[in-house]
Amino acid sequence: MEHDNGVTNFHFEVSADIFDEEELELIGKMRPGLIQLEIGVQSTNPDTIREIHRHMDLVKLKQAVDRVYDYRNTHQHLDLIAGLPYENYESFMHSFDDVYRMRPDQLQMGFLKVLKGSYMEEQVAAYDLRYRGIPPYEVLSTKWLPYSDVIRLKGVEDMVEVYYNSGQFPATMKLLERKFARPAEIFTSLAEYYEENGLTGISHSRLARYEILYKFLEEKEENSGQSAPAAETTEGDEQKTGVENTAGDEQKIGVETAETMEKPTLSDFRDSLMYDLYVRENIKSRPSFAGDQSPYKKEVREFFMAEEENPRWLTDYAGFDSRQMAKMAHLEHMEDGTFVLFDYKKRDPLSGNARAVRFVYDPNENRMTKVEEWLLYTGRNFLN
């Protein structure tokens, strides 16, 4: 690290379960963004892992991923492969839940490629593999995974890319985890919504993705109490897989389940979506669901005037008057009654998200009082 030029970054494919203490400590000392780790989990189904001749300690892998996550200086990409032996749709989504709960920066879904001369090509008949005859020789169906389920997983992959891997919906993803019974259901439900509303195969703008997600949530709110689980294990699945995928049972992530947490409201989602929009950039066009800010012009104007006279929260804006600061930063009134300041001169070195400070307005003191300073993406105060 003594030769780090502060610019060059490195990408490593690693087996995180064999990291030792010295290696983990070294990662913790690195400059944010110096390295990026790609960890090929592929599956958490023990029969699948055994059949493809992999040796992986999922408990140690999770511990290593958690440790690196807490450093918040290294992007971690965890990979899953659909179409492996003994993995049907529900088994794959169980693996998806296990890996999602490890909180990767990206959860990359791939599809099995049957390369010439590979072990998988040798097992074509045994696994009843159907795959494309031209590059990339991607799987179309297996003994355990019919073509219709491959198509379903393609839809899930698209939603994961847009709403999770993009990093553009950090606060909203946290709320979605509370709304749905399991992580997989978030993305299967979104994929079904896109398909049912003719939204697939279209190049949507960034703002359109937020509008679509809000309409999806509105519909869920209207139909609450009538929704069915997005993915159910059909009778006979255990016979077809030869396994009930329990690989993650002993090492489930220590988080509250959706059933034990208070369900977010549509108002909560409006706040989270506005947070997600502004934490990335000072947007010029506001979405249709955005709250009216005109009743709070006085509080916003007084905040920036106070910062011009005596900079407290926007110390990097010296030389700019209050009107200029109001254009360079942004103060948004949320539906929960608080204000959130977005400071674009200070950004998280890993995610690129702006510094965010939550305030409440004290009418007696005629000023804003800080509540907390945070990035929901990292879950910690990023100035500390």
Predicted region positions:
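Radical SAM enzyme core and accessory elements
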Residues: 158-384
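Phosphate/diphosphate-binding loops
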Residues: 98
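Short secondary-structure transition/capping segments
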Residues: 22-31, 58-64, 87-90, 120-130, ...
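Generic recognition of stable, solvent-exposed alpha-helical segments in well-folded globular domains
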Residues: 13-14, 18, 22, 56-63, ...
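Sequence-level motif detector for i,i+2 pairs with an aromatic at +2
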Residues: 7, 148, 354-356
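Short, surface-exposed, charge-dense and proline/glycine-enriched linear segments
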Residues: 8-13, 38-44, 68-73, 106-116, ...
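Flexible glycine/acidic-rich beta-alpha junction loops that bind and position SAM and/or redox cofactors
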Residues: 47-52, 84-91, 103-188
